[in-house]
Design a protein with these regions (language model features):
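N-terminal, positively charged/glycine-rich alpha-helical extensions of SAM-dependent methyltransferases
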Residues: 2-6, 13, 26-65
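A short acidic, Gly/Pro-enriched loop at the edge of an enzyme's catalytic core
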Residues: 150-160
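Conserved alpha-helix/loop element of class I SAM-dependent methyltransferases that forms part
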Residues: 73-93, 109
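Conserved catalytic/acceptor-binding region of the Class I
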Residues: 186-248, 262-272
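Class I SAM-dependent methyltransferase SAM/SAH-binding core
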Residues: 96-150
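A short SAM/SAH-binding and catalytic strip from SAM-dependent methyltransferases
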Residues: 158-172
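Conserved Class I S-adenosyl-L-methionine
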Residues: 74, 103, 237-317
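A short glycine-rich, Lys/Arg-flanked "PGG" loop and its adjoining helix->strand segment in the class I
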Residues: 173-188
């Protein structure tokens, strides 16, 4: 195991935690957001009982909205791939929506590859700062917390898309089932989500340092696939992708995630001493993501298309 070239002292560790919002946030794993909304009049988000974690997710992405797209190379590449998979789908009548649209990466990738789309997807996201940077979100598009389910305008949807958003929800499996249930017969759900197996270097460092791992727990790929099938989806394409970045020390990794806004954690933040131990034990190994991509169709439409081949890579990840 190789140590980082420089370990911050206690004061620097405290300053770094404050930079990430240590009063509310921990140090967390990957997030991501994606996103002309055909439907414009969403209710304003004003639920005083909204879970605290949901609020921390919004705040993290809001603080980093200006730097998000410059850092989100993986999210851009996955968005392009998912858009390619949706390029030739026979879409039934009904609304389209991008769930967790953020700055609009996924919907823009879809429209670039399917410019004849009848209408652009509605942009749904909790973070107003990201929606303000989304060229597909109209001025009346209000934030929406996907933990509340989907707005009534999305009943009998023809296409629901989501990339790097489901993992931030309180119950990903239940929300996946809810999304599938809102499709029209023959409607499509296209999903990309980071899954368990990601960030193994972070987990290894936490074990070696005997500190809590504050990375976001990610859903199991098999559980998501099973939930989709139980919800009545016929899966046309299912693929588990692995992505990695060159080895970097722990501090650089956490700063990268901070620049994306992925700073919310379900765990209390590490204290400065714990942070120093974590960074000292961080292995010199690639940072790895495991991403599940699937496209499924709700039963009741025309016969499903043959299984789609893997699309060519788009912009580099």
């Amino acid at each position: 195991m190789t140590l980082p070239s420089r370990i911050p002292d206690a004061a620097e560790g405290q300053a770094f935690q404050e930079q990430l919002g240590s009063d509310q946030d921990g140090l967390v794993s990957v997030g991501g957001r994606h996103g002309r909304g055909g439907l414009r009049t969403l209710p304003q988000l004003a639920d005083p009982a909204r879970p605290a974690f949901s609020s921390r997710v919004r705040q993290g992405f809001g603080r980093s909205a200006a730097s998000y797209e410059a850092q989100a190379r993986l999210q851009q590449g996955v968005a392009w791939r998912l858009g390619r998979l949706c390029r030739d789908l026979p879409l039934p009548a009904g609304p389209y929506a991008d769930l967790g649209a953020g700055s609009g990466l996924l919907s823009r990738a879809l429209l670039a590859q399917r410019p004849s789309l009848a209408k652009p997807p509605l942009q749904l996201d909790l973070c107003p700062e990201l929606l303000a940077r989304n060229p597909l979100a109209g001025p009346t598009t209000a934030p929406w917390d996907l933990n509340r389910g989907l707005p009534p305008q999305l009943r009998d949807a023809g296409l629901l898309l989501s990339s790097f958003a489901l993992q931030w929800l309180d119950d990903p499996l239940a929300q996946l089932a809810n999304w599938a249930g809102r499709l029209a017969p023959g409607g499509w759900l296209a999903l990309a989500v980071p899954v368990a197996g990601s960030f193994d270097t972070w987990q290894a460092a936490a074990r070696a340092a005997s500190v809590p791992c504050t990375a976001l727990p990610l859903p199991e790929a098999d559980g998501l696939i099973e939930a989709a099938i139980r919800s009545g989806l016929n899966l046309r394409h299912t693929q588990r992708l692995s992505f990695s970045r060159a080895p970097r020390d722990g501090l650089a990794t956490l700063r990268l995630l901070s620049s994306l806004g992925a700073t919310a954690s379900r765990q209390p933040p590490l204290d400065p001493g714990q942070l120093r131990r974590l960074l000292a034990h961080w292995p010199a190994a690639p940072l790895r993501w495991e991403v599940l991509v699937f496209v499924g169709r709700r039963s009741g439409g025309a016969p499903s298309l043959p299984a789609a081949p893997s699309p060519p890579d788009g912009p580099p990840c």
